[in-house]
Structures are given as C-alpha cells and as structure tokens.
A protein has these predicted regions:
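Non-transmembrane, aqueous-exposed alpha-helical and coiled segments at domain scale
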Residues: 4-264
Length: 264
C-alpha cells in the first residue's frame, strides 16, 4: 500500500522503508511468537480439565467500558471481567475469582468527568509522589489528572466487574499526608447520592468528602496487616466498608513482593 509510505515520507519526513529489511524484521518477530501460537480456547479447555489454574488479565477500568462506562469517553471493547470468558473462549462459570485493582487515590488520563479531581500544588505533589516514579502516561509521558479515592465510582466499578477481591495499591504513596480526603458521595442538584449516576448527571456532580487522619510514616517493607499503622488500617477498613467489597490485598511499595495479604 503506497499511502503509508507517502505519509511516512511527506508527513513524518522519515526515510523510506526497504521492503527486504522490513520482511527480514517481520520474519524474526514471526519466529519469536510462533511457539506460542495455538488454538487458545482448546488449550485453556484442556488446562481446565487437568485442574490447572488460569489467570486472565484485563486492562482499563469499568468506566471505560463502552456499555457501562462514561460514554463517549470509553474504549472500543468491553473492560469488564465477564468479557474475559469471551476473549479466552471459556465458559463464564469457569471464572471463580475476580480481583479488581484499585489505587488508594484516583488518577486519570484524558478528558471525561472526574468528580474527586484535585488541582494545583495539591495535585502536583500527589502526582510527583504517585505511581512508580510519578503519575505520568506510560507511553506519552503526559501528566495524569489526580484526585482522592472515589468510593462512589469504585463501588459501581466493583459491582460491574462482579468483584470477589479488591487489590488496594500504592497505599505507601499517601504516607506524606496529615489528612486524607475521601469522596463518599456526589451532590447533584442539591441532593446527595452514593450511587453512580448516568453520564449527563455525572457532569453536574460535586464531591462529598470525608477527611480521615493520615499515618505520616513510610509503610514500605511492612509484611503483615497488623504491623501497619493504626490510621493506615482505619483508612483501608473505611474504604472497604464504603465500597462493600473485601480488600484482601494491599500493596505498600513498587516491588513484586510488596504485597500484604489480608484474611477475609
């Protein structure tokens, strides 16, 4: 196709691609992935029969789902756990556990309603400290929009996912705060609701905040839930009560092993 070549040359001012070099590169990629190409549905079907455990991973949150998200600020295919069965080609009833990953605060990339959003120095500080090296887009490096934990949106997201467990991440980031606001409701047209509204009402929503005391210390390296500072545990338990789903995992650092498991 000549069009991509013309775009490459005249729009991006890049050298023309040599077809032989491109073919060689693609052949190398083919050889890399060839051992992993198979009938995925059959492969997983046999694994289930053998009693093996299967982990399916999704990306993006419930609010990006084209059917149940904040349309039109959504993606092109379903982001809900139920769609995992369709994508993998396995029966829905084989999915026994659904782990929903929630940050201990909120962040977002791009436009769309963001009720608990914060601005200015408050947002800059959380953005700088957040994530693994700051809250910036992985591909573009774009600064993410920042906000406090939103119980209303998270409760809705967990419900749509069919959550059995919540993994509560980047909790260590909040250790610098004296007080931590949490969005526990939305005020819309003078009335307060704790249920996630339809999109046109969401645009009018103002956050109802409850402030919890911070723990003002570094919690990295802690291995058991009981060792966490009291105010840290209270924060987790307050969120759990508000969203109505069990927080069974808490991450307190960027490492693979920086996870505290809670008993139900």
């Amino acid at each position: 196709d000549a069009l991509p070549i013309l775009i490459l040359e005249h729009l991006y001012h890049k050298p023309l691609i040599n077809p032989d070099d491109l073919y060689k590169e693609l052949t190398e990629y083919r050889d890399m992935v060839a051992p992993f190409v198979c009938d995925v549905s059959l492969y997983l079907h046999n694994a289930i029969k053998e009693g093996k455990e299967i982990l399916l991973e999704g990306q993006l949150g419930s609010l990006k789902d084209p059917d149940h998200g904040i349309y039109p600020m959504v993606t092109s295919s379903s982001t809900l756990a139920a769609y995992g069965a369709i994508g993998a080609g396995i029966p829905p009833y084989e999915i026994k556990q659904i782990i929903t990953v929630c940050k201990a605060y909120s962040s977002a990339v791009g436009a769309g309603a963001f009720v608990s959003e914060i601005f200015g120095e408050e947002a800059d500080e959380l953005r700088r400290r957040g994530g693994d090296g700051g809250e910036f887009g992985a591909t573009t490096g774009r600064p993410r929009r920042m906000g406090w934990f939103d119980c209303v949106a998270s409760k809705y997201g967990c419900r749509m996912q069919g959550t059995t467990d919540v993994a509560f991440t980047v909790l260590d980031v909040l250790g610098y705060l004296d007080e931590i606001p949490v969005c526990v409701g939305y005020e819309i047209n003078g009335e307060v609701t704790t249920e996630f509204p339809v999109t046109h009402l969401l645009e009018k929503a103002k956050p109802v905040l409850k402030t919890l005391p911070g723990w003002k210390c570094d919690i990295r390296g802690i291995k058991t839930y009981e060792e966490l500072p009291e105010n840290c545990r209270k924060y987790i338990e307050f969120i759990e009560e508000q969203i109505g789903y069990p927080i069974t995992m808490v991450s307190n650092g960027p490492g693979r092993d920086d996870i505290i498991y809670r008993k139900r």
